[in-house]
């Protein structure tokens, strides 16, 4: 319908979302990021590429200021619960749904934050830790179920899947997915399903 959202770039903790088709194109770990010079920092240059990050117990953060995800983010309430269980809720000094802002605040020494791995740049000098168990979040495109896509929306799907962290095989999957989706919508419209 006119004025309704039909498609969105969407981070999520799960891929089965009511009323949506979710086209997942990337998994990434949610990492604890510490500012430069934090007492729990380590020499990040010694971390080997492709190897797991060190693991930290959040309770070790003590009185470290925490930058939290806003509740409207896909993982905001879960992150708040994790901080709460570690006794760190009183340390939360700021919340935002703008992840690059949280990263910049860590970079500028304001506090620690849980941020998706794709934002991390080792050259920035901040330290990252995994949690145990690891927390995986998904990046993808949410489409309103049964809604026929415009050419512009199809183009955006191709653009995102070909350029935003997707493994190479996902580049070809975009064509297949869109073709199969059209067949499902056509079959539904003609009561074949």
Locate predicted features.
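Beta-alpha-beta core module
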Residues: 17-23, 28, 53-56, 100-147
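Secondary-structure junction motif
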Residues: 34, 42-86, 150-153, 164-177
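Short beta-strand elements of ligand-binding domains
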Residues: 7-13, 35, 69-70
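Alpha-helix C-terminal capping/helix-to-coil transition sites in glycosyltransferase folds
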Residues: 2-4, 27, 63
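Hydrophobic hinge/microswitch elements
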Residues: 1-4, 11, 72-127, 186-192
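A late-sequence structural motif
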Residues: 127-180
């Amino acid at each position: 319908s006119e004025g309704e959202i039909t498609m969105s770039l969407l981070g999520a903790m799960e891929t089965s979302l009511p009323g949506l088709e979710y086209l997942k194109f990337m998994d990434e770990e949610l990492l604890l990021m510490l500012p430069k010079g934090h007492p729990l920092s380590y020499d990040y240059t010694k971390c080997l590429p492709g190897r797991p990050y060190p693991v930290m117990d959040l309770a070790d953060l003590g009185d470290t200021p925490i930058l939290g995800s806003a509740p409207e983010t896909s993982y905001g309430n879960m992150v708040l619960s994790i901080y709460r269980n570690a006794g760190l809720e009183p340390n939360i000094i700021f919340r935002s749904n703008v992840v690059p802002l949280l990263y910049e605040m860590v970079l500028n020494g304001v506090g620690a934050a849980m941020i998706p791995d794709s934002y991390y740049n080792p050259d920035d000098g901040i330290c990252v830790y995994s949690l145990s168990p690891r927390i995986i979040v998904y990046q993808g495109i949410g489409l309103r179920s049964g809604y026929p896509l415009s050419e512009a929306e199809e183009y955006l799907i191709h653009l995102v899947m070909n350029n935003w962290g997707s493994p190479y095989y996902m580049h070809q999957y975009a064509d297949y997915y869109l073709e199969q989706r059209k067949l499902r919508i056509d079959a539904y419209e003609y009561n074949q399903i």
